[in-house]
A protein has these predicted regions:
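Selective transmembrane-helix segments that form parts of the transport pathway or gating/packing helices
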Residues: 8-35, 52, 56, 148-151
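Short helix-loop junctions at transmembrane helix boundaries
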Residues: 27-49, 57, 71-76, 96-102, ...
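Hydrophobic alpha-helical transmembrane segments
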Residues: 48-56, 60, 81-82, 110, ...
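Hydrophobic alpha-helical transmembrane segments of polytopic membrane proteins
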Residues: 50-76, 91-94, 149-158
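Short hydrophobic, aromatic-rich alpha-helical segments embedded in or entering the lipid bilayer
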Residues: 100-141
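Junction motif at the cytosolic side of a transmembrane helix
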Residues: 127-130, 144-168
Length: 168
């Protein structure tokens, strides 16, 4: 596609857009499943909007990270293995499988450099409050903002890598 009239940057952005549209559809199905499973208690929760936004931003992080990995790995079996190792590793380090209050402080300090840590921090904060205090709301917005920054960094890395690969 390097001989195409469409610029490389536009091709990359359209690929990202396609991925986000497909991911958004799957996210919508997942949210509908959660609403069906929990009935009126979940959408009736005061924190429902925060939960929805948190999952949406985390989906953007996951999709952009997977796209970035896909730029480097061309074998689908290797891609699947790397994705499993990364996702399970982040889940173990960031408190998805093991509660954060049980984890060592040093592990938690390291996990702050991973997006799943902030996703879990927001979820734990939302789970602790039926009505968010001002401090809790600041903590939630900080976590969601950091997740969004991870997604933006990954997208910028995708654009830089694709540009480098096409110039090479």
């Amino acid at each position: 596609m390097q001989a195409s009239a469409v610029s490389a940057r536009r091709q990359s952005l359209e690929g990202l857009l396609t991925m986000f549209v497909m991911g958004g559809g799957l996210w919508g199905i997942g949210m509908a499943g959660a609403i069906l499973m929990y009935g009126k208690t979940f959408p009736g929760s005061e924190n429902f909007g925060y939960y929805v936004l948190n999952t949406l931003v985390m989906m953007a992080v996951a999709l952009s990270l997977s796209y970035l990995i896909g730029l480097f790995v061309k074998n689908s079996n290797m891609l699947s293995g790397i994705a499993n190792i990364l996702s399970l590793g982040m889940c173990f380090l960031c408190g998805v499988f093991v509660p954060m209050n049980v984890m060592d402080r040093n592990v938690l300090k390291v996990s702050q450099f991973l997006p799943v840590y902030w996703y879990e921090t927001v979820n734990e904060t939302l789970g602790s409050y039926s009505h968010l205090t001002r401090e809790a709301a600041v903590s939630v917005w900080k976590g969601i903002g950091l997740e969004a920054m991870f997604a933006m960094v990954f997208v910028c890395m995708i654009l830089a890598v694709t540009r480098y690969q096409r110039q090479k």
